Amino acid sequence: MTHRTSLSRTPVLKSGLAAIGLALGLTLGLALTAPSPARADRCDDLAKDLTAQIPGLKIGKTIAGVIYLEHPAVTQASLGCPSRNRSNDVFASTDKKKPSPDFYDFVATAAALVFTIPKNDTLKGAQRCVSRTNIIRGYNIDSRYRRLDIHCTVAKTGVRITISREKGV
């Protein structure tokens, strides 16, 4: 009578199967613990999208999660990358005490692209915030419009607007 031996019971095949199992386990473990793409990559992509959509916009330096932007309608502009308690934010300033329509257009277009909401909503929110600054209310106003946090400051040196959205909203 012939005796059949199982292939998995031979010592050579046992060690080979163990080696293959170990290799698959290590490969899977490395794949799961591999570093994911950094948030700055998404922020850089967003800045490139802004330059493609807004004529005259150029990307400047990136320092500590903030991408500085250059545009003829603004003195300073930046795109803030996400952090723990905020999503992106858009900052723009001008030297004029009464901003030009080009300034508002830049702020509205950038915020609309970053937060994927209609441009008219961001335009109205920015204009409303700046128009509310006066002697009685003060020259440093925080407002909320269409789920956006809009902070504007009006001084003798000009107007500064920051538009952001709380994380999870």
Which role fits each region the language model picked out?
Residues D41-N85:
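N-terminal secretory signal peptides
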Residues A38, L57-I67, T116-R146:
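Short glycine-rich, low-complexity/disordered patches
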Residues N140-K167:
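Short, exposed beta-strand-loop hairpins at the edges of beta-sheets
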Residues T33-A40:
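Sec/Tat signal peptide C-region and signal peptidase I cleavage site
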Residues G16-T33:
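Bacterial N-terminal signal peptides
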Residues M1-K14:
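N-terminal secretory signal peptides that target proteins for export/translocation
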Residues D49-P55, S87-S93, I136-Y139, V159-I163:
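Extracellular/mature segments of secreted proteins
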Residues A77, S83-T133:
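Long, charged/polar, surface-exposed segments that mediate recognition or autoinhibition
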